[in-house]
Amino acid sequence: VSYLKHAAQGLEECKQVLYLLGPVGGGKSSIAEKLKYLMQQVPIYSIKGSPVNDHPFCLFDVKEDGDILQKEYGIPKRYLKTIMSPWARKRLHEFNGDITQFKVVRVYPSVLDQVGIAKTEPGDENNQDISSLVGKVDIRRLEQYAQNDPDAYSYSGSLCKVNQGLMEFVEMFKAPIKVLHPLLTATQEGNYNPTEGFSALPFDGLILAHSNESEWQSFRNNKNNEAF
């Protein structure tokens, strides 16, 4: 509870993965299921049509708008630190900078619809890459858009789905180490890079990982994993 409270206040916990360590049958999955259930009870606000649940505050600049929003609406400046996704930035250019053209929707996270909640499991070294977390280009759209166009991208990765939500990473340390790298920047910096050459995608959510003790010991003893 203290972890979630401090993370919500923007303290150091918001830059950390919530990691559950324990033996098989110790209740790790039960805690994860309970958190996902609770997450579905409270709605989130996002820009209508955003494939990564862009928060409306991403349209404001903390330096230019921070004082006004705090004075007139009581919105703390720390809430304005989320970046705008490439998709939202493209829409902003199409609207000639008029943010009133954006619509805001109130959405309830859903496990079944994978809105704000997603589950990731480790795969084989040969068939799992970072696209399972960050998405990839949709080949079918390349007839209409350039490869580095935000509208040609498939935001199917777990990190894309869980902005403002919760991602459960089952047996995290069984995954190839290359797959885990986006988690570092997502938690530490609040954004991560897609597989194509456009700007970073926003992340403001909870990453919940769990594994048993033997997997953790093996992972920790490998000096190459020190950053994690």
Please place each PLM-identified region on the residue numbering.
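Conserved ASCE/P-loop NTPase catalytic core
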Residues: 1-228
